[in-house]
Curated annotation (Swiss-Prot):
Gene: patA
CDD domains tied to this protein: OAT_like
Record keywords, A-Z: Aminotransferase, Pyridoxal phosphate, Transferase
GO BP term, pick one: putrescine catabolic process
Name of the protein described by the UniProt record: Putrescine aminotransferase
UniProt organism field: Escherichia coli O17:K52:H18 (strain UMN026 / ExPEC)
C-alpha cells in the first residue's frame, strides 16, 4: 500500500480505499502502513478523542488494534492477525454473530435486484418486515415505522406520542435517571447523563426524570404532573438499563409502571434497542413480565450485524395519527430493501435456532462464573449482574474497570465500559457464543483479575 500524500485529491483517496476494500489479505508491511494511516486519519479527520479512549483500555497503552475482518461468528481479527473473542458485540449489534451467512445471503440476494427503493412505488420487503414484526412483538403492536438507528427510533416514538396526546392536552414525558435513549435532540432530552446533555442545553422542554426501579417515585411524578396540569403524554424507559450499567429493576417494576400508565392515561414507550432481539433470554425483555407497551423501539441487532436499521412499532390506536398524512414523519433510507432483507433474515435465524433460549442458558453460565470471580476478588469486584447475554461486572472504582478492559484485551477478549457508568464493564457477546468460548471468557477474566491484584499489591 503506497502512502497517500497529505494533499491527495478526493479521487485519489477514494481509489486508495477501494484498493484496500478489494484486498482479502495484507502482508506485514501493508498491515503496518494501514495501522499508521488509520491512526493518522482518526486524529486529523475523525476525532482524536477516540484514539485516547482506545489507548486507555488496550494493552500496552497503545491505540489498540485496527479492525480488519470477522474471524467467525463470535470473533474479530485485527490487522496483525490476532483473533479476539467478541464480548462487546458492537454494543448489542451482533446477536446472530458476525457475518451470519443467512443474513449476508439475504442482503446479497436483494443487492442483486434493487438495493434502495424508488420512494414512489410500494416496496415489498418493508411490507413483509412490518407484517413479521406485528407477528413477533407482544400484544397489540401492529404498525411499524422504519429508520436507521436507535436514536431515530426513539425520536419517532416521542413524536408519535406527542401527535397522539397533544389533542388530549398531554405534553410531559417521564424518563428515568441513568437512562440512555440516544443523543439526537429529542432522545437526548430523555437521556439522563449530564456529560452528554450540558453542552446542548436547553434541551426539549417537558421532560422529567425519576429514579429507575422506584415505582413510588414514578407514581408521585405522574400524580404531581396531573395536579399541576402538566399531564404526562408518555413514560419512556428501558426494561434493563444498558448504558446505565446493566441495571435491572426490581421484579414487577415494569408491570407496575404499565398499570400506572393505564391509570393516568399515559402511553408506555419501551426502548428495547439494546435488550430486544433475544438478548435477555426472551425475544423482548418486556416479555419476562408479559408487559405490552404502546410503543416499542428497536434497532442494533435488528439488522443482524450487517445493515443498520431501526424500528418504532405501535398499536393501531396510537399509530393511526399518521394515517391521514403518512409524510408527517419519514426518512429517506428508512425501511430500504437491504436493511429489511437483513432484518427479516435476522428474525428467521433467531427463531429457527432458538437463540433467545440459548442466550438464557449461556448467560446463566457466564454470570455464574463472573459471580464466583466477584467472591474471589472482593477487593476489585463490587458485583456481577445481568440477564441472558446482557451482563456487567462492576468494579470498586473507575480505574479498575479500565484496567480490566486492558487486561482482557491482553487475553484476546474484547469488552468495554458503559456510557453512563464508568465503573462498569459490559459483557454483551453474540448469542451464538459457544460453550467452549464461554469457558475461555471466564478463564480470561480470572487471569485478568489475578494480574490486576498483583499490580495493586506491588504498587
Amino acid at each position: 500500500m503506497n502512502r497517500l500524500p497529505s494533499s491527495a485529491s478526493a479521487l485519489a483517496c477514494s481509489a486508495h480505499a477501494l484498493n484496500l476494500i478489494e484486498k482479502r489479505t495484507l502482508d506485514h508491511e501493508e498491515m503496518k502502513a494501514l495501522n499508521r494511516e488509520v491512526i493518522e486519519y482518526f486524529k486529523e479527520h475523525v476525532n482524536p478523542g477516540f484514539l485516547e479512549y482506545r489507548k486507555s483500555v488496550t494493552a500496552g497503552g497503545d491505540y489498540g488494534a485496527v479492525e480488519w475482518q470477522a474471524g467467525g461468528l463470535n470473533t474479530l481479527v485485527d490487522t496483525q492477525g490476532q483473533e479476539f473473542i467478541d464480548c462487546l458485540g458492537g454494543f448489542g449489534i451482533f446477536n446472530v454473530g458476525h457475518r451470519n451467512p443467512v443474513v449476508v445471503s439475504a442482503v446479497q440476494n436483494q443487492l442483486a435486484k434493487q438495493p434502495l427503493h424508488s420512494q414512489e412505488l410500494l416496496d415489498p420487503l418493508r411490507a413483509m418486515l412490518a407484517k413479521t414484526l406485528a407477528a413477533l412483538t407482544p400484544g397489540k403492536l401492529k404498525y411499524s415505522f422504519f429508520c436507521n438507528s436507535g436514536t431515530e427510533s426513539v425520536e419517532a416514538a416521542l413524536k408519535l406520542a406527542k401527535a397522539y396526546q397533544s389533542p388530549r392536552g398531554k405534553f410531559t414525558f417521564i424518563a428515568t435517571s441513568g437512562a440512555f435513549h440516544g443523543k439526537s435532540l429529542g432522545a437526548l432530552s430523555a437521556t439522563a447523563k449530564s456529560t452528554f446533555r450540558k453542552p446542548f442545553m436547553p434541551l426539549l422542554p417537558g421532560f422529567r426524570h425519576v429514579p429507575f426501579g422506584n415505582i413510588e417515585a414514578m407514581r408521585t411524578a405522574l400524580s404531581e404532573c396531573k395536579k399541576t396540569g402538566d399531564d404526562v403524554a408518555a413514560v419512556i424507559l428501558e426494561p434493563i438499563q444498558g448504558e446505565g450499567g446493566v441495571i435491572l429493576p426490581p421484579p414487577g417494576y415494569l408491570t407496575a409502571v404499565r398499570k400506572l400508565c393505564d391509570e393516568f392515561g399515559a402511553l408506555m414507550i419501551l426502548d428495547e434497542v439494546q435488550t430486544g432481539m433475544g438478548r435477555t433470554g426472551k425475544m423482548f425483555a418486556c416479555e419476562h413480565e408479559n408487559v405490552q407497551p404502546d410503543i416499542l423501539c428497536l434497532a442494533k441487532a435488528l439488522g443482524g450485524g450487517v445493515m443498520p436499521i431501526g424500528a418504532t412499532i405501535a398499536t393501531e390506536e396510537v399509530f393511526s395519527v399518521l394515517f391521514d398524512n403518512p409524510f408527517l414523519h419519514t426518512t429517506t433510507f428508512g425501511g430500504n430493501p437491504l436493511a429489511c432483507a437483513a432484518a427479516l433474515a435476522t428474525i428467521n435465524v433467531l427463531l429457527e435456532q432458538n437463540l433467545p433460549a440459548q442466550a438464557e442458558q449461556k448467560g446463566d453460565m457466564l454470570l455464574d462464573g463472573f459471580r464466583q470471580l466477584a467472591r474471589e476478588y472482593p477487593d476489585l469486584v463490587q458485583e456481577a449482574r445481568g440477564k441472558g447475554m446482557l451482563m456487567a461486572i462492576e468494579f470498586v472504582d473507575n480505574e479498575i474497570g479500565y484496567n480490566f478492559a486492558s487486561e482482557m484485551f491482553r487475553q484476546r477478549v474484547l469488552v468495554a465500559g458503559t456510557l453512563n457508568n464508568a465503573k462498569t464493564i459490559r459483557i454483551e457477546p453474540p448469542l451464538t457464543l459457544t460453550i467452549e468460548q464461554c469457558e475461555l471468557v471466564i478463564k480470561a477474566a480470572r487471569k485478568a483479575l489475578a494480574a490486576m491484584r498483583v499490580s495493586v499489591e506491588e504498587a
